[in-house]
Swiss-Prot record:
Compartmental location: Cytoplasm
Region annotated Domain II, chain positions: 65-143
Stretch list, region Flexible linker: 144-171
Highest taxon listed in the record's lineage: Bacteria
Domains: entry comment: Has three domains with a flexible linker between the domains II and III and assumes an 'L' shape. Domain III is highly mobile and contacts RuvB.
Gene Ontology BP terms: DNA recombination; DNA repair
Name under which the protein is recorded: Holliday junction branch migration complex subunit RuvA
Ranges for region Domain III: 172-224
Subunit comment: Homotetramer. Forms an RuvA(8)-RuvB(12)-Holliday junction (HJ) complex. HJ DNA is sandwiched between 2 RuvA tetramers; dsDNA enters through RuvA and exits via RuvB. An RuvB hexamer assembles on each DNA strand where it exits the tetramer. Each RuvB hexamer is contacted by two RuvA subunits (via domain III) on 2 adjacent RuvB subunits; this complex drives branch migration. In the full resolvosome a probable DNA-RuvA(4)-RuvB(12)-RuvC(2) complex forms which resolves the HJ.
Positions of the UniProt region annotated as Domain I: 1-64
Family affiliation: Belongs to the RuvA family.
Originating gene: ruvA
Any one GO MF annotation of this record: four-way junction DNA binding
Function text: The RuvA-RuvB-RuvC complex processes Holliday junction (HJ) DNA during genetic recombination and DNA repair, while the RuvA-RuvB complex plays an important role in the rescue of blocked DNA replication forks via replication fork reversal (RFR). RuvA specifically binds to HJ cruciform DNA, conferring on it an open structure. The RuvB hexamer acts as an ATP-dependent pump, pulling dsDNA into and through the RuvAB complex. HJ branch migration allows RuvC to scan DNA until it finds its consensus sequence, where it cleaves and resolves the cruciform DNA.
Amino acid sequence: MIGRLSGVLVYRGRDHIVLDVRGVGYVVQCSERTLAGMPAPGGPVALFTELLVREDLLQLYGFPTLLEKEWHRLLTSVQGVGAKASMSILSTLGVDGVGRAIALGDWGALRKAQGVGPKIAQRVVNELKDKGPEVMAMGGTLEAALDGVIEDGMAASEGIEPPSAARPAVPSAASDQAGALSALVNLGYGQGEAASAVATAAGEGAVGETDIIRAALRLLAPKG
């Protein structure tokens, strides 16, 4: 299994890149958001990867963060959602949007992804409503675990020091939401209701872990 690749960008296509790793060129499928963040050819790239193995195909999919990779694995666990549909969802919504849609039961947001119909969108929400919050809560943990690992690995494998933009990292918004979710769960709220409140708070403009917690607590407070 190939879990991560770091090397030099050779080519960027419409839905994939060619990554040179010590003289070997790997074709890696990526979401539109990931492709948009790629450097110019010749620049350093590090991606976490998932290998799809079929009788007639070996296909690598690349992700700038472990959080996005985990969402891809979770999405493709749903019947009817293949790698292509998962990449379309991630391209359209990003990791924050996917987590928010599932936490809020907003299958209409998932329908915006090309190739995702209403039945599939509803199935994703229904099957992942309990598992999604667990992935949302991983954001901060993954960020801490990655600190310094990518730079050291790329420097050792390629003899170059990658710029900070090339380092896969969990987006700060995802980390803030993960921290807020963890805090609410520690206060005794159920993971599902906490995730819904965090997603709503973030969607209404709360920024930063503290503000998200405060806004979520207001949403969770008994009415009347």
